[in-house]
Amino acid sequence: MLFPAVLAVIAVAGAAWWLWPGRHSEPQQPQAESTSAPVQPYSAPRLSIVVLPFANLRDDPQQEYFVDGITEDLTTDLARIEGSQVIARNTAFTYKGKSVDAKRIGRELGVRYVLEGSIQRSGNQVRINTQLVDAETGAHLWAERFDRDAGDLFALQNEITARIARALQSQLAIAESRRPTARPDALDYILRGRAVLTKPISRERYDEAASLFETALALDPQATDAAAWLAALLAARVVDDLSDLPNEDLHRAERLAAQALAMSPSSALAHYVKGQVLFAQSRCKEAIPEYERAISLDRSRAPAYARLGFCKFLTGSVEDAIPYFEQAIHLSPHEPGIAPWFGRMGVIYLLQSRSDEAIGWLEKANSENARLAFVHAYLAAGYALKGDPERARAELREAQGLSNAYFSLASVEKSNWYDNPKIRALAEATYFPGLRRAGIPEE
């Protein structure tokens, strides 16, 4: 889908946003050329972009308000990204209805990227095509098509803009990280670190990204986004059991999160990161309002929905958790870390004795990332409950090969996933018996 891609583009760009105050900018008047020095080629600012008015392919004046609304909302959403420089709506609309080359627009407005698209409505169906273009080279960096039932146009407009924004965040960061830089600054290293985190997680990738964020902080100790991303990474490394020094990582993550919030109290990323640190400290009840605040500040922050859903689950609100995971998956279906979201949906369904749905989600998670031990363990229980002992035993062996936590049921039962009495009762009726049938020892 088109919007997830676009959203991806801007998500990575988000790293740059934190160091560079976002603002709308109008084209600047050229300065008088000096006759005493050679003229240097103009280089557009990083993360500078114009959202061109989307084309109304049906040529129906009655639909112009919807088409223009998409353009205006995207302009507003992208401008919230710290570090972005978004051309103001009034300037962008001077290109409405005109066929102008993206490279020419880049020169005229001084931007690196052009987002363009079209909307066609037929009856109750709406098709939206969008693409991100490198204004310096004319290359297409990302494109996607979005087909939806018109239904509530206002809700559709919100959905579309959120998904595009999310996609653009990642794509812009990736694009910026690939540009050669003679003298990299803090922002360059932040973008490089963000680009690394768009790939499937591993100990090596965490280490690589951490090194880049550390370099950014060394260059600029006041870089809010560098502090925030490093804190998020340290907390995630602990949660994913990929930290050699978990206590030290958590203590430092806590300090960095506090630093980021002090420097930028209205930062969606900073609130999300504080939630991540609290989650890593097994303080889900305190993390929930931080995730909710992050979402209120940035409705496209898909990981915040997923983590909020997981905290709802861990605190006993099992039914309430599902819509948050569904929204996260809907906003960012190509998220690099989407496998745990699929897996936790499977966990919830298994605990609800919905084995077929559970296995479906767990297999989706496994196809995205085959190294998640909890996914294999829940698959073992699911297949055992379905009467497939051979597959159940195979999945249990996979889980045991990935984590020592699955060599006895007593060890599994110690997980903080089952601290809540409601969750433990559900597990005792479904998951634990399934593991027994799969062959896990009691002790």
Q: Over which residues does each language-model region extend?
A:
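Acidic, Ser/Thr-rich low-complexity linear motifs
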Residues: R178-P180, S243, P340, A405-I423
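A generic structural signal for well-ordered alpha-helical surface patches
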Residues: A377, A394-R397, A429
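Terminal, low-structured helical/coil segments at or just beyond the last alpha-helical repeat
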Residues: L409-E443
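Generic surface-pattern signal
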Residues: Q169, A173, T198, G401-N404, ...
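Acidic, proline/glycine-rich low-complexity intrinsically disordered segments
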Residues: L2, V6-L7, A11-E357, W361-K386, ...
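TPR/TPR-like (Sel1-like) alpha-helical repeat modules
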Residues: A384-F407
